[in-house]
Amino acid sequence: MRRCPCRGSLSEAEAGALPAEARMGLEALRGGRRRQPGLQRPGPGAGGPTGRPEGGGPRAWIEGFSLHSEAERTDFGPAPCPDGPQAEPCGDEHEECEAAGLGVASEKPSQNKELDGSNLQTHPKLSSPLAEMEMAGSWTDGFRTDLHRPDLQARPKRASLCTQPGFDESWTELDRSELWQTLPERDKPWVDHLRTHQDMSRLQNHPACPSPEPSAGTSCKELSADGSRTPHDTDGFWIESQTDGSLIGPSTQTACRQPANDGFSAQDTDGTLIQPGTDDGPWVDSVLEKSNGDDPLMEPEPRDLVTNLCSHLECSSLCPVPRLIITSESPEPGAQPLGPQARIEGGTGGFSSASSFDESEDDLVAGGGGTSDPEDRSGSKPWKKLKTVLKYSPFVVSFHKHYYPWVQLSGHAGNFQAGEDGRILKRFCQCEQRSLELLMGDPLRPFVPTYYGMVQRDGQAFNQMEDLLADFEGPSIMDCKMGSRTYLEEELVKARERPKPRKDMYEKMVAVDPGAPTPEEHAQGAVTKPRYMQWRETLSSTSTLGFRIEGIKKADGTCNTNFKKTQALEQVTKVLEDFVNGDVGILRKYVARLEDLRDTLENSPFFKTHEVVGSSLLFVHDHTGLAKVWMIDFGKTVALPDHQMLSHRLPWAEGNREDGYLWGLDNLICLLQGLAQS
């Protein structure tokens, strides 16, 4: 039985708990790129000759977009049926489950867009007042709406930012006349045709509330001037109003705010694995500590982002997740305290997000680490000295006589163990097993881990899958959590029926924002997990873009998981640019791979009939130019009731089970395309 990564100690490593090779830096030389055992694996999941060919044309969904009613859209299917039976999610003991395996990269050239656009038009709901929006800037010109109504006319040749209304509302078409630049010496084409969720049914005009700097505590921003306003996110350009009384986007702590109490949920990756280099020094667990005031961890600065957005979005009376928790059940134990500070050295790394529900341990602040300033967004040095935690590697992978240690970046210990022949064992989760088995026969197979079934080890069950990183040399890795929510509807129902206090969740919440808990929650010192997750999602780009960055490990060993309040478009764009170090070739490969994935998702029977919640996209590239993306984390992917299908783009309202996966993917592709063009 291997020791879990979060309960070891430095003294054990020094006393010889590790093999000599692990303690001395695994000095074995690498002999080129690693391959899976035997000949090149056939099949689409192995990256071999039968995989997807590289190359291909860009998507044409932006231009010439025809307008259809919702029923006519081939990728949407019939309307959701909220009353049908739902698949049972994995239990709490398996919430940390995720997937990792090999896929195949395919490449398409990026698509260039000319920017145009001049005026603003809004199509509100019949009973709602006219909502207006004003925007300035060349890189936001040409917003576009993703239309579902046959009575609206498309405006040809307009790159667009798509706003997603509620279910009965009209779609908004946004034009601008002035230039808007946020970074000097560069156009910003990547916001063309980005999408936002918007509930237009209760839109109200509101006086402007200028805000000179983006922050999670405001809901009004100055946006240059055509005299119109629309509900908007505080730090970005996307907002989604919820019918359960919650809103994503701005905080609820300013005078000009949206009337949400619970907001959307959030979630960290658990069990994320990372391989430090094999140069020298002990293996380091890269759980990112909160930096103290003397050495703050800097988030990218949203340079000169000026917007002016005000609105009141009224919410329905659906019962929110309870905030006052009264129960006799004892709270679950929190994460282990963080250890001494260290920095990862070396190249080869592994990174795999785990639990779709449990948050990563880097949320907790323990020991003498202190907390970083959540409002510090100077961005002048986005990859400053990072503080990590020294722990020994949970296991060492041996593949083709190449040894590389796996270190858990965040999350619960014991999720992963080393398999044989470059395979990884992940703690068993029935939902994930069922999903992976179905995906092996679905068109999505090249984009998901290759699955080898369940195995038993030391009396414990594991799902066996391929190591996603076996073909990379010193990779850079990024985990993006996809979708507009990361919790199942069943979890909300359970939280209402049997609210369970979580002291560790309360500590995580106050570490980020001491004023976030209610007085009752402060008195009890605990919050429910869905309550924490809903609050957490209001801070991140999950609420504004339909995806959020969970963590990044770069080839030089630098790790960063401090993206809890990375919400604004500019912040997310800067992080993506730093991840690839401005390499246009890598960006184009990522764009081609994601466009191919989007095409496959829209034609996948599995995807149309499953609610995909808490799933991630794993981005991996190395110095050789190899770049791939995979879908991972299927521990909370559940089948829909019979005859129900999802669009994966509509806003979520309790009962419709929409997850917003394609909405987030559309926006992610747009951002990467813009970076490649610039």
Swiss-Prot record:
Residues the record lists as Phosphoserine modifications: 160, 398
Keywords, comma-separated and alphabetical: ATP-binding, Calmodulin-binding, Cytoplasm, Kinase, Nucleotide-binding, Nucleus, Phosphoprotein, Transferase
Binding site for substrate: 481, 502-508, 529-536, 636
Pfam families per UniProt: IPK
EC number(s) recorded for this UniProt protein: 2.7.1.127
Biased composition (Gly residues): 44-58
Disulfide bonding pattern of the chain: none
Regulation: Activated by calcium/calmodulin. Inhibited by high concentrations of the substrate Ins(1,2,4)P3, and allosterically activated by the product Ins(1,3,4,5)P4.
Placement of sequence motif Nuclear export signal: 318-326
UniProt GO MF annotations: ATP binding; calmodulin binding; inositol hexakisphosphate kinase activity; inositol-1,4,5-trisphosphate 3-kinase activity; kinase activity
Cited SUPFAM superfamilies: SAICAR synthase-like
Bias (Polar residues): 240-256
One biological process term in Gene Ontology: cellular response to calcium ion
Group of enzyme by EC: transferase
Reactions mediated catalytically: 1D-myo-inositol 1,4,5-trisphosphate + ATP = 1D-myo-inositol 1,3,4,5-tetrakisphosphate + ADP + H(+)
Main location: nucleus
Location relative to the cell: Nucleus; Cytoplasm
Role noted for this protein: Catalyzes the phosphorylation of 1D-myo-inositol 1,4,5-trisphosphate (InsP3) into 1D-myo-inositol 1,3,4,5-tetrakisphosphate and participates to the regulation of calcium homeostasis. Can phosphorylate inositol 2,4,5-triphosphate to inositol 2,4,5,6-tetraphosphate.
Protein name as it appears in the record: Inositol-trisphosphate 3-kinase C
Organism: Rattus norvegicus
